[in-house]
């Protein structure tokens, strides 16, 4: 059993899915692609966690009777704190992805029944003691998960209450609606960071956050301010990070807000945006956790920098980036993560707020 919170820095309750992707002709379809929100968020945290720190990245993979051997080998190469659960009485969760209207929008449907993860999956595992959790769910489910995770921790260790983990909530797109607005405000009190994309943010308020050429910066700031005024976090000191694709992200906490650009400024560098947002959140979580500043905004800004880098690797190809090893250390898609991080920080020094 891992020590309480010492071994696992990050745990996602997003799912692992095997993807089948159908492109517009004449490009042939691809099958048995590693995917799912949980996988991409684990990737985001893993990119900033070379071994032995890689084992601090927690995620759960439910392996059905048809789970491909090569995917087991692939997952093992990441050397993470993954929990592989054998479920031989079912098929692995699989999804179909098809492009609608060119390359802009990817439609999705499940090909096999999904097996959703909840707090029970953490019981009796080191993942329960993670220092941060990524939740991708509805507002009401978010509240349930936070309450149940904290209850489980307290049941096993009475002093766990003093070591509250960071909860990062990614609202599930289908339920970012005005009907869920009040539930959303309730859920904000339970988590530390909320991170929707700008369309999902607008959905809760019934507002359009898309401008003609780029995201509507002022509308996004205004709606985010309303969340902050309502209160994010148990003590009202939480933050919002609104992801805006090619336009970067808005980071905001009480009394402070700041925009950050996306790493890739050219559309040519983006092969497939799928998983970019999830990867961002994995990088964000470990970036906030390992920042070590007493300033909430400084921690969130460090997290957003790391998240932007993680997302940049996720969207350069269909599926996962290629992990390689050299004398100098790990590379992803042939690039050293620290080199890309340094490059990004240099660019941020001259970035003009929109």
What are these regions (language model features)?
Residues 1-14, 155-161, 180, 206-354:
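Conserved phosphate-binding/catalytic region of the ribokinase-like
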Residues 18-31, 47-136, 148-150, 158-164, ...:
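Conserved N-terminal subdomain of the carbohydrate kinase-like
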Residues 26-33, 208-214:
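Short glycine-enriched, charge-decorated loop/helix-capping segments at active-site entrances
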Residues 31-37, 219:
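A short, glycine/small-residue-rich beta-strand->loop->alpha-helix junction that serves as a flexible
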Residues 36-48, 146-153:
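Histidine-anchored nucleotide/phosphate-binding helix
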Residues 43, 95-99, 248-252:
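Short beta-strand scaffold segments in enzyme catalytic cores
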Residues 45, 197, 277:
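Short, conserved phosphate/pyrophosphate- and ester-handling motifs at nucleotide-, phospho-/glycolipid
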Residues 130-225:
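Conserved beta-alpha-beta core of the PfkB/ribokinase-like small-molecule kinase fold
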């Amino acid at each position: 059993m891992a020590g309480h919170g010492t071994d696992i820095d990050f745990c996602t309750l997003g799912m692992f899915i095997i993807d089948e992707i159908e492109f517009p002709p004449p490009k042939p379809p691809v099958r048995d692609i590693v995917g799912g929100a949980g996988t991409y968020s684990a990737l985001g945290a893993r990119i900033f966690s070379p071994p032995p720190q890689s084992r601090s990245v927690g995620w759960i993979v439910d392996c059905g009777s048809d789970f491909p051997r090569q995917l087991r080998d692939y997952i093992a190469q990441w050397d993470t704190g993954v929990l592989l659960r054998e479920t031989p009485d079912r098929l692995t969760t699989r999804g179909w992805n098809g492009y609608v209207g060119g390359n802009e929008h990817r439609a999705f449907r499940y090909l096999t029944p999904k097996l959703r993860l909840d707090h029970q999956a953490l019981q009796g595992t080191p993942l329960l003691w993670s220092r941060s959790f990524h939740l991708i769910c509805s507002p009401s489910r978010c509240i349930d998960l936070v309450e149940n995770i904290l209850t489980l921790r307290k049941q096993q260790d009475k002093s766990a209450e003093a070591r509250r983990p960071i909860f990062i909530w990614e609202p599930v797109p289908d339920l970012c609606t005005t009907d869920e607005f009040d539930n959303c405000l309730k859920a904000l009190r339970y988590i530390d960071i909320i991170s929707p994309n700008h369309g999902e943010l607008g959905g809760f308020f019934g507002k359009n956050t898309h401008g003609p050429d780029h995201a509507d910066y002022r509308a996004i700031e205004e709606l985010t301010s309303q969340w902050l005024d309502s209160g994010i976090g148990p003590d009202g000191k939480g933050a919002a990070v609104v992801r805006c694709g090619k336009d970067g992200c808005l980071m905001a906490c009480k009394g402070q807000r700041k925009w950050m650009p996306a790493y890739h400024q050219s559309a040519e560098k983006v092969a497939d945006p799928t998983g970019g947002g999830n990867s961002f959140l994995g990088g964000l979580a470990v970036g906030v956790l390992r920042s070590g500043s007493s300033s909430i905004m400084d921690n969130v800004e460090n997290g957003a920098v790391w998240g932007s880098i993680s997302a940049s690797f996720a969207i350069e190809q269909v599926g996962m980036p290629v992990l390689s090893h050299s004398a100098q250390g790990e590379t992803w898609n042939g690039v050293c993560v620290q080199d890309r991080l340094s490059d990004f920080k240099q660019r941020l020094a001259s970035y003009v707020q929109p």
